[in-house]
């Protein structure tokens, strides 16, 4: 998922890992694991 802020990653990361947290690196979400 593309992003500008870590908040942009909440929904895509929740879908991907079940965890609504991630970093935004090079405009791409890098999702954390819970």
Curated annotation (Swiss-Prot):
GO terms for molecular function: ion channel inhibitor activity; potassium channel regulator activity; toxin activity. The record marks 21, 25-26, 33 as: Important for activity. The modification Cysteine amide is found at residue 34. It comes from the Eukaryota. The keyword Phosphoprotein does not apply. GO terms for cellular component: extracellular region. Amidated. The amidated toxin shows 5-fold more affinity for Kv1.3/KCNA3 than the synthetic carboxylated form. Keywords: Amidation, Calcium-activated potassium channel impairing toxin, Disulfide bond, Ion channel impairing toxin, Neurotoxin, Pharmaceutical, Potassium channel impairing toxin, Secreted, Toxin, Voltage-gated potassium channel impairing toxin. The keyword Transferase does not apply. Signal peptide: none annotated. It is found in: Secreted. Expressed by the venom gland. SUPFAM superfamilies: Scorpion toxin-like. Pfam families: Toxin_2 (PF00451). Disulfide bonds join 3-24, 9-29, 13-31, 19-34. Belongs to the short scorpion toxin superfamily. Potassium channel inhibitor family. Alpha-KTx 06 subfamily. Has the structural arrangement of an alpha-helix connected to a beta-sheet by disulfide bonds (CSalpha/beta). The lower affinity for Kv1.1/KCNA1 is due to HsTX1 inability to come close to the pore domain, which prevents the pore-inserting lysine (Lys-23) from making proper contacts with the tyrosine carbonyls in the selectivity filter of the channel. Potently blocks voltage-gated potassium channels Kv1.1/KCNA1 (IC(50)=7-11 nM) and Kv1.3/KCNA3 (IC(50)=11-29 pM). Also mildly blocks intermediate (IK) conductance calcium-activated potassium channels (KCa3.1/KCNN4) and ERG1/Kv11.1/KCNH2. Shows ability to suppress proliferation of lymphocytes, which are known to be sensitive to Kv1.3/KCNA3 homotetrameric channel block. Negative results: does not block Kv1.2/KCNA2 potassium channels. Does not induce hemolysis. PEGylation of HsTX1[R14A] enhances its circulating half-life in rats, reduces its affinity but not its selectivity for Kv1.3/KCNA3, and dramatically reduces its adsorption to inert surfaces. PEG-HsTX1[R14A] is equipotent to HsTX1[R14A] in preferential inhibition of human and rat CCR7(-) effector memory T lymphocytes (TEM) proliferation, leaving CCR7(+) naive and central memory T cells able to proliferate. It reduces inflammation in an active delayed-type hypersensitivity model and in the pristane-induced arthritis (PIA) model of rheumatoid arthritis (RA). This is Potassium channel toxin alpha-KTx 6.3. It comes from Heterometrus spinifer (Asia giant forest scorpion).
């Amino acid at each position: 998922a593309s992003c500008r802020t870590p908040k942009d990653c909440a929904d895509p990361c929740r879908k991907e890992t079940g965890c609504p947290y991630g970093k935004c690196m090079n405009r791409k979400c890098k999702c954390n694991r819970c």
